[in-house]
Amino acid sequence: PEEICTLVIAESFPEDAGIFTCSARNDYGSVTSTAQLVVTSANTENCSYDSMGEPNSDHFQHFPPPPPILETGSYELASQKPSEIQQVNTPNLGFNMAALQMQFNSAERETNGVHPSHGVNGLINGKAYGNKSPPTPAALLSPTKEPPPLLAKPKLGFPKKASRTARIASDEEIQGTKDAVIQDLERKLRFKEDLLNNGQPRLTYEERMARRLLGADSANVFNIQEPEETAANQEYKVSSCEQRLISEIEYRLERSPVEESGDEVQEAEVPVENAAAPFFEMKLKHYKIFEGMPVTFTCRVAGSPKPKIYWFKDGKQISPKSDHYTIQRDVDGTCSLHTTASTLDDDGNYTIMAANTQGRVSCTGRLMVQAVNQRGRSPRSPPGHPHARRPRSRSRDSGDENEPIQERFFRPHFLQAPGDLTVQEGKLCRMDCKVSGLPTPDLSWQLDGKPIRPDSAHKMLVRENGVHSLIIEPVTSRDAGIYTCIATNRAGQNSFNLELVVAAKEAHKAPVFIEKLQNTGVADGYPVRLECRVSGVPPPQIFWKKENESLTHSTDRVSMHQDNHGYICLLIQGATKEDAGWYTVSAKNEAGIVSCTARLDVY
């Protein structure tokens, strides 16, 4: 991503001259850019205005050095006759006058002839001429290679030479002019945005640079500081990371129980063929505003029967009786949530969910609330109120101008959390959760209020999809209790609790034969029983085999029987010669297996 880095010198002095280097580094390398700053000192003879000067006084020939670009010089363009224009052959003025002419033309083109009081460089003072362009001094249009002349318009009479030193502008004048420059630039950007919305050409490179220097929220700041213009909420697009977070919140809310207010009237049932799941005809939008401003989320929902509406902030349901939020619903399905004065705590994701008997649907709008002084500039003084005077030294300590940029923090929020668990002793237990927040929260686990330390039986893992897991293997009776998961970051903390119940391990006992099979003989055509008794904990499973062939199911002639007391029987109705042979019965459970064999003879 691009980033514009700017070094601003509010008032230049000769000692500021030199080579300035900007370096950028990351893990993959570094890059540098170098530029030289030349500061031209003022001439020994400086100009001043004589309020009582005569019309035929000598014209002045020396000027203070021009102010640097993006600063606060305030020369006026005089629409004098060519005979009254004086040329000053000072090479150092060439670049600044070229910049002045470029800005002059740009301002005229972008404002349809209405010339702002200050341009981007702070070099223009003009007036509104309606649809007519002001007369352009001939000297500025001269195609010669000589430096363009500097035009001056004296307030009273013509300027004359004077031996006094130039007056240094006061802090109030400097600050006032800087504010005027910034205000004018914001006006131009707003005007350009209106053109863009109407399909006009895109912003130029210089305008994009100015937008980045002022910040993307320049239009909103302008609205706040000029009350005569209506402040409007600024829509913006959320990042892919925020969109994933929004999707996870909606997925969870649509599958979670909600609190019923009881105020809504129960809708009459509609025929199944006329029923329709809720859907949004107009979804919520994302807004970026300043604290103290009002904001309204609006959408329109339809469905049959009429859906019930629920509002959430960061996954937490908003009560319809909230004092801070006003919730409304019109007959056409338009739903709105409004707050008259937003605070920094209102920053977050706002979700509306519509539900009826056919299903649920939700959509989310992101609200970004910014502090009024977020851009690092002090609020402008109201009209008629001068700026407070601050001490200023030649060293120009810029400590106040290097205030840190305000970061965005989001309190941890659990997107997924487990409920109470019951696990058998000796088994594996896994507790999974997923949390969001900025910066990334740190998770800790507690058992009955005591921290859990990782060891051979307790492991804490984080998967690539952001799911945190506490794994206990094997579970013992000491692991039973109330578990607390705490997520913490710079914005705050959040937690959830669950209870783990450990079921006692059964006392396993291997099967054992109390009575074994006995060798048996039977006459052909008569019934016969092969019987035994077995015990074991848990009760064992029984398997029968004849020779090496398994008897898997009973038939009308050969059936297998078993009761709860361990009695086992193989019943053969009408034995034949083919039934003779060796029979084996096996008993098996988790603790072991045991077998017994006997012979059946048929004669």
Swiss-Prot record:
One of its GO terms (molecular function) is actin binding. Keywords: Actin-binding, Cell junction, Cell projection, Cytoplasm, Cytoskeleton, Disulfide bond, Immunoglobulin domain, Phosphoprotein, Repeat. One of its GO terms (biological process) is actin cytoskeleton organization. It is found in: Cytoplasm, Cytoskeleton; Cell junction, Focal adhesion; Cytoplasm, Myofibril, Sarcomere, Z line; Cell projection, Ruffle. The lineage of its organism: Eukaryota, Metazoa, Chordata, Craniata, Vertebrata. The keyword Signal does not apply. In adult central nervous system is detected in the brain and spinal cord, specially in the olfactory bulb, cerebral and cerebellar cortices, hippocampus, amygdala, superior colluculus, and superficial laminae of the spinal dorsal horn. Residues 278-362, 412-503, 511-601 form the Ig-like C2-type domain. CDD domains: IgI_1_Palladin_C, IgI_2_Palladin_C, IgI_Myotilin_C. Residues 414-503, 513-603 are annotated as: Interaction with EZR. SMART domains: IG (SM00409), IGc2 (SM00408). Interacts with EPS8. Interacts with LASP1. Interacts with VASP. Interacts with ACTN. Interacts with SORBS2. Interacts with PFN1. Interacts with LPP. Interacts with SPIN90. Interacts with SRC. Interacts with EZR. Interacts with RAI14. Belongs to the myotilin/palladin family. Residues 63-67 are annotated as: Interaction with VASP. Phosphorylated predominantly on serines and, to a lesser extent, on tyrosines. Phosphorylation at Ser-395 by PKB/AKT1 modulates cytoskeletal organization and cell motility. Induction: Up-regulated rapidly and persistently in astrocytes in response to injury. The modification Phosphothreonine is found at residue 136. The gene is Palld. This is Palladin. PANTHER family: CAVP-TARGET PROTEIN-LIKE, IMMUNOGLOBULIN. Disulfide bonds join 433-485.
